[in-house]
Amino acid sequence: MSIKTIQLGDIAIANDKPFVLFGGMNVLESRDLAMSIAEKYLEVTQKLGIPYVFKASFDKANRSSINSYRGPGMEEGLKIFQEIKDTFNVPLITDVHEPHQCAPVAEVVDIIQLPAFLARQTDLVIAMARTGAIINVKKPQFLAPHEMRHIVKKFNEAGNDEIILCERGSCFGYNNLVVDMLGMDEMKQSGYPVIFDATHALQRPGGREDSAGGRRAQATELARSGMALGLAGLFIEAHPDPDNAKCDGPCALPLHQLEAYLSQMKAVDDLVKSFPALDTSK
């Protein structure tokens, strides 16, 4: 197995490199909040020496309720992303939901994300691939790890091999997700960079009357377990007031705990990647 390295400017994304943080907020709530959250992430990651990519969504198109907040939309969202990029000189990742969004988003954003619920939509995959951007594929909650190869093959055949695979939990009965650590290792065998969405994996889908619940109190334990696998990156969302966040607050980290949280993740990553490779199949 060869390990694929994706180069994003001076950031190397690979399973054998120091982990990259893909972090920010769930959805753009306002320009000012996005700027302040990006500034906090950048301050902490620079202090800890962690490569960093800012994440937020301009539209949450799969909310539980039609009345739930979705975001500012693509046009306004891209303006905010451009300002964050210009102000902080930080790369960006965001998700798209329709083929027509791909080209304009790729003009501003460095990594385009394929949402888990849409990962088998061929027209969307082709449109994303044709931008030439780096692609982050969220593993659907309903697919086995080995089935990710079909999605990767679609991207490859559409002309794009700059692919990151992201674990975000698997359905376990009703209203619950679990994380299969061996499944993440299985995805690593593809050679592609694997990252762990440790906060969305805390979701309890449909856990509230009209929105998803979550288990924020277990955010540290779950992320440490994932980092022990030796991954290319960690994907998290934080908020200064999670209980009043407009989307997925029950899963969001309190922003004031970001430095302490990431210090632990970096320590685990550094330790695991200092070990020599050990093949126990022989």
Swiss-Prot record:
One GO cellular component term noted in the UniProt record for this chain: cytoplasm
Location(s) in or outside the cell: Cytoplasm
Principal location listed in the UniProt entry: cytoplasm
Catalytically driven reaction(s): D-arabinose 5-phosphate + phosphoenolpyruvate + H2O = 3-deoxy-alpha-D-manno-2-octulosonate-8-phosphate + phosphate
InterPro entries registered for this protein in UniProt: Aldolase_TIM, DAHP1/KDSA, KDO8P_synthase
Pathway(s) of this molecule: Carbohydrate biosynthesis; 3-deoxy-D-manno-octulosonate biosynthesis; 3-deoxy-D-manno-octulosonate from D-ribulose 5-phosphate: step 2/3; Bacterial outer membrane biogenesis; lipopolysaccharide biosynthesis
GO molecular function, one term: 3-deoxy-8-phosphooctulonate synthase activity
Keywords linked to the UniProt accession: Cytoplasm, Lipopolysaccharide biosynthesis, Transferase
Protein EC: 2.5.1.55
Top-level EC class: transferase
GO biological process, one term: keto-3-deoxy-D-manno-octulosonic acid biosynthetic process
Family label: Belongs to the KdsA family.
Protein name: 2-dehydro-3-deoxyphosphooctonate aldolase
Protein source organism: Shewanella amazonensis (strain ATCC BAA-1098 / SB2B)
Higher taxonomy: Bacteria, Pseudomonadati, Pseudomonadota, Gammaproteobacteria, Alteromonadales
